[in-house]
Design a protein with these regions (language model features):
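Sec-dependent signal peptide recognition
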Residues: 2-10
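C-terminal motif of bacterial Sec signal peptides marking the signal peptidase cleavage site
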Residues: 14-17
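Short, well-ordered, aromatic-rich surface patches in folded extracellular/luminal domains
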Residues: 20-46, 50, 107-270
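Extracytoplasmic low-complexity, Pro/Thr/Ser/Ala/Gly-rich segments
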Residues: 22-88
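Short, structured motif recognition centered on aromatic/hydrophobic residues
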Residues: 58, 97, 101, 129
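A short, structured loop/turn motif at beta-sheet edges
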Residues: 62-63, 90-94, 131-137
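Generic detection of long, well-ordered alpha-helical segments
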Residues: 87, 91-94, 151, 155
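Charged, amphipathic alpha-helical segments
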Residues: 90-118
């Protein structure tokens, strides 16, 4: 309670000092395990299964925990699973982040995308920020963030938000190991040449058959969400796999992509 009171006071001082041209400020819920902010890179030119496997870049909880994708080893093939890290950013940094959220105007934005760069940049991704409060979800996106200079202060705020969260993810103290409770698994048939350097073929790792997975439209990709013991077992197997691991089911080879699901994500829905 003392921590929350101190943070609310700090936010009030920031709001008084900096103001907000939108007339409202970002707030924190009482429940510390509530997700208040997420950033992501969405879309872009990539195989469909990689687009479907995209996950939040940063996930910030009301209690100050920041979960993000950690550094990946500079090797190929790299690990199959994304590297996840969890830190605690502290009260001062939380106040700084929420001030940037105000600068972007997220508390009064429903769903807005800046596409200024689309005239000169093709096939780039959207940098997206999601802010969650008692009124719902607030989304602001910038196409090709950082590639094209713009005078829009909201775009500058987005660059500041991503940069600030990147720094906090590296410099803040650890909040313990991040453990996923649910996992999204994507599978697609894929030819494998076992003579290709690094390629390995392993037995199908899931209790469900490939045919039991949900088809994603007509994209040739199937999906399922694992929870509890199934998720734990799959993560254990996937931890020993890499980007060139393929999976055999009755003579048919598959490529599998997997990622953790956060509490506010359903999985297998697009």
């Amino acid at each position: 309670m003392r921590r929350l009171t101190a943070l609310i006071a700090a936010l009030a001082l920031l709001a008084t000092a900096c103001g907000s041209d939108e007339g409202t400020t970002a707030t924190l819920p009482d429940e510390g395990d509530t997700i208040i902010l997420q950033t992501a890179y969405e879309g872009g030119f990539a195989p469909v299964e990689f687009i479907l496997n995209q996950m939040p870049q940063h996930t910030l909880y009301a209690d100050g925990r920041l979960v993000s994708q950690g550094p990946q080893p500079a090797i190929f093939p790299g690990p199959m699973l994304p590297s996840m890290q969890q830190v605690n950013i502290g009260d001062a940094a939380m106040a700084e982040v929420l001030a940037i959220v105000d600068d972007i105007g997220l508390p009064t934005t429903t769903d807005e995308t800046n596409t200024e760069a689309a005239a000169v940049v093709a096939d780039a991704s959207d940098a997206v920020a999601y802010y969650y409060d008692e009124t719902g979800t607030h989304r602001y996106a910038v196409y090709a963030l950082g590639i094209v200079e713009t005078a829009d202060p909201h775009v500058a705020g987005m660059r500041s938000l991503f940069d600030t969260l990147d720094v906090l993810a590296v410099e803040s103290p650890s909040a313990g190991e991040y453990v996923a409770e649910r996992v999204q698994v994507l599978a697609t048939q894929s030819f494998v040449d076992e003579n290709e350097p690094g390629a390995t073929l392993e037995p199908w790792p899931l209790a469900a058959r490939p045919a039991d997975l949900s088809e994603v439209a007509d994209l040739g990709v199937s999906c399922t969400v694992l929870e509890g013991d199934e998720a734990t077992a799959a993560l254990t197997v996937f931890a020993d796999a890499d980007q060139m691991t393929f999976w055999d089911y009755e003579g048919v080879s598959y490529r599998i992509l997997a990622r953790p699901l956060f509490e506010n994500e359903v999985g297998c829905e697009w």
